[in-house]
């Protein structure tokens, strides 16, 4: 079993962590994130190091411990560096463009799809067929990218659709005639 929960989280310069009744606030150069952690996990902040402790070694406690540590580490990385998810579009006439904070996608439907940026999320469109989702909250960045991908999932015959950058789409052969 992984022992990720026992690892110490080292805070980069400019990142400040406060804990009040297991509601942890992480402030950094890119913004501020707040999250409530389970009451069974004890969070200790000592200078530039944060450690999490569990009350016992039951399987349930180990899973909660590792998840809480990973969530807190993602908050620290988010406010210091941020997260980004890149998507690419394949298909004839598939294109993306920004209208203010709104992302407008033409993906072979009779109407364009419009995606509003959730709070703390920004979109970039470096080329007409590339989309970059940026933000400080890893979960929201991933959910937003997954929603955009879900608007036109890559199909296995021609590979048309929206995919993550570097994603491998398994291809199938079409029907063969008689």
UniProtKB/Swiss-Prot annotation:
GO terms for molecular function: rRNA binding; structural constituent of ribosome. It holds the Pfam family Ribosomal_L6. InterPro entries: Ribosomal_uL6-like, Ribosomal_uL6-like_a/b-dom_sf, Ribosomal_uL6_a/b-dom, Ribosomal_uL6_bac-type, Ribosomal_uL6_CS. Keywords: Ribonucleoprotein, Ribosomal protein, RNA-binding, rRNA-binding. Disulfide bonds: none annotated. Coiled coil: none annotated. One of its GO terms (biological process) is cytoplasmic translation. GO terms for cellular component: cytosolic large ribosomal subunit. This protein binds to the 23S rRNA, and is important in its secondary structure. It is located near the subunit interface in the base of the L7/L12 stalk, and near the tRNA binding site of the peptidyltransferase center. Part of the 50S ribosomal subunit. Belongs to the universal ribosomal protein uL6 family. PANTHER family: 60S/50S RIBOSOMAL PROTEIN L6/L9, LARGE RIBOSOMAL SUBUNIT PROTEIN UL6M. This is Large ribosomal subunit protein uL6. It comes from Streptococcus mutans serotype c (strain ATCC 700610 / UA159). The lineage of its organism: Bacteria, Bacillati, Bacillota, Bacilli, Lactobacillales. The gene is rplF.
